[in-house]
């Protein structure tokens, strides 16, 4: 799947106080090798005394390896990740089902150099998911508990779904579904904002820094929420597989097959749904 990002400095409208304060960027790099393309800046390998790892078992029997690459903040961050992991695994499994990797590796880096070497991310990124592991940047320590819960759920969904996600999948839909798994519910935007929200985003919108990207993520999320509310959560999963999986259909055909309705019909119903007063 292509790289996708969420701006660190943008605010997500319509989500209430919890997400209004979200400042940390979460990135998904499914399908990429663990080492980024090109030659990263030289970075020293952590020594055996600096690096440490431990393995835990979550409630469903999956194992989680928590790996610290040294520094004073990585272990406290991993403690927080450990406390949030059961909830994240349960949220992903509730939506996706139990058939996804049983072994999860989470790495906390101590420097921007380490993060770039492992995941290709910059200093404005909190986490990255490669085909093998979820990597947290040093800046992730600034996340609130609510933000960490959202980022971990979001990244873990991408990790769980990576084998069923094509490289050319519509990224706006993969991100919308990941946010459906990760983000808490919020009141409907109402009639005044419905016309602005009820437009399907494009992948190009996700790549446009600023309000365009913020609105694109909101639109994708609201669309997935509508599909789950109107057609059922299993139908949203079917839509993901038909629109984003290997040998996927285009979005219009996938909607018709997964939801049993024409895309235009679905969009009209979506606008009406958004216009409701909660």
Residue ranges: model-predicted function:
Residues 1-59, 278:
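N-terminal low-structure segments adjacent to metalloprotease catalytic domains
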Residues 32-34, 93-98, 221:
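Short, surface-exposed loop and linker segments with low hydrophobicity and enrichment for Pro/Ser/Thr
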Residues 36-50, 106-112, 132-138, 177-184, ...:
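Short, mixed-charge, low-aromatic patches
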Residues 52-170, 188-189, 248-251:
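Juxtacatalytic substrate-recognition/specificity segment
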Residues 129-133, 146-151, 164-278:
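Acidic/His/Gly-enriched intrinsically disordered linker/tail segments
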């Amino acid at each position: 799947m292509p790289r996708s990002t969420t701006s660190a400095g943008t605010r997500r409208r319509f989500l209430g106080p919890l997400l209004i304060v979200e400042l940390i960027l979460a990135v998904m790099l499914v399908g990429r090798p663990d080492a980024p393309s090109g030659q990263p800046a030289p970075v020293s390998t952590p020594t055996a005394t600096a690096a440490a790892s431990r393995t835990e078992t979550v409630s469903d029997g999956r194992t989680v390896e928590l790996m610290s690459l040294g520094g004073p903040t990585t272990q406290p961050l991993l403690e927080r990740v450990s406390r949030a992991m059961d909830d994240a695994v349960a949220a992903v499994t509730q939506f996706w089902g139990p058939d996804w990797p049983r072994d999860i590796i989470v790495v906390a880096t101590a420097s921007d150099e380490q993060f770039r070497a492992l995941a290709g991310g910059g200093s404005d990124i909190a986490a990255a998911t490669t085909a093998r592991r979820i990597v947290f940047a040093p800046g992730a320590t600034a996340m609130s508990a609510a933000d960490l819960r959202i980022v971990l759920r979001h990244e873990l969904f991408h990790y769980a779904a990576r084998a069923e996600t094509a490289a050319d999948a519509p990224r706006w839909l993969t991100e919308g579904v990941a946010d459906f798994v990760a983000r808490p519910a919020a009141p409907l935007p109402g009639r005044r904002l419905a016309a602005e929200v009820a437009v399907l985003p494009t992948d190009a919108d996700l790549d446009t820094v600023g309000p365009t990207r913020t609105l694109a993520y909101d639109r994708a999320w609201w669309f997935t929420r509508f599909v789950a509310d109107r057609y059922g959560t299993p139908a949203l999963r079917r839509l993901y597989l038909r629109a984003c999986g290997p040998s996927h259909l285009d979005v219009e055909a996938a909607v018709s097959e997964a939801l049993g309705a024409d895309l235009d019909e679905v969009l009209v119903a979506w606008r009406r749904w958004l216009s409701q007063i909660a």
